[in-house]
Amino acid sequence: LSLKPLLQEKGLERSRVVRMADLNETFGYQIFTGARHPSRNKVLQIAFAMALTLKEANRALTAARVSVLNCKDRRDAIIIFCIDRGCSLQKVNEELYRFGEETVS
């Protein structure tokens, strides 16, 4: 999973993204260096921390070899809605919880 180009493109620091994604510092570092393969939820946590677009988030999910967001899936539809509106990780988790769906983190 190569997120370095996106970090540079968006002018973000890896340490800040890891913190905003609510990831363990070591695990987050290992994801960014490619030493660890993140779960779908971890990729989504990073996507929200980096404020990725839907296209960028799906590209990251594909690179991580997990399923892309599917608007026909209720949970994914809520996540897509939140991505489109630039919501924070906290906000998407609140929305998922409100609808009785599994949170991202």
Which residues are covered by each model-predicted region?
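A short, Lys/Arg-rich alpha-helix, primarily the initiator
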Residues: 1-14, 90-105
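The alpha-helix within a helix-turn-helix
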Residues: 7, 18, 47
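Recognition helix of helix-turn-helix/homeodomain-like DNA-binding domains
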Residues: 21-38, 63-65
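Short, charged recognition helix plus adjacent turn
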Residues: 58-87
